[in-house]
Amino acid sequence: MTQVAKNDHRLMQVLLAPVVSEKATLVADKNEQVVFEVARDANKAEVKAAVELLFKVEVQSVQILNQKGKQKRFGRFMGRRNHVKKAYVSLKPGQEINFEAEAK
């Protein structure tokens, strides 16, 4: 496993937003996982370090998903949605991230 540079500025840029969807909430309830949208150049070690730094929790594992943007029609023009990189973060037993309490 590679050593992660403890550059706090870089780690603050890794996590972009939590993913709020039906699938993400099912995964969170069933498997104690949290889904984040992450930077396109982020790796598993950086995501793990960023979650542990920002939320003060212990991470068990990280799975990365590269989602291609869909082709969509805008009027008579064809376009494409942006590509997205997601991270499924598994927390150790007993750990929890509460986004409502973090916002206060």
Swiss-Prot record:
Give the GO molecular function terms: rRNA binding; structural constituent of ribosome
Source organism, top-level taxon? Bacteria
Look up the record and report any one GO term of the cellular component aspect.
ribonucleoprotein complex
Signal peptide segment? none
Instruction: List, alphabetically, the Pfam families matched.
Output: Ribosomal_L23
Look up keyword Ribosomal protein and say if it applies.
yes
A Gene Ontology annotation in the biological process aspect, one of them, is:
translation
**What InterPro entries does UniProt report for this protein, alphabetically?**
Nucleotide-bd_a/b_plait_sf, Ribosomal_uL23-like, Ribosomal_uL23/eL15/eS24_sf
Keyword set, alphabetical order: Ribonucleoprotein, Ribosomal protein, RNA-binding, rRNA-binding
Family note:
Belongs to the universal ribosomal protein uL23 family.
Report the function annotation for this chain: One of the early assembly proteins it binds 23S rRNA. One of the proteins that surrounds the polypeptide exit tunnel on the outside of the ribosome. Forms the main docking site for trigger factor binding to the ribosome.
**Subunit comment:** Part of the 50S ribosomal subunit. Contacts protein L29, and trigger factor when it is bound to the ribosome.
Protein name, UniProt field: Large ribosomal subunit protein uL23
**Organism name:** Cupriavidus necator (strain ATCC 17699 / DSM 428 / KCTC 22496 / NCIMB 10442 / H16 / Stanier 337)
Gene, per the UniProt record:
rplW
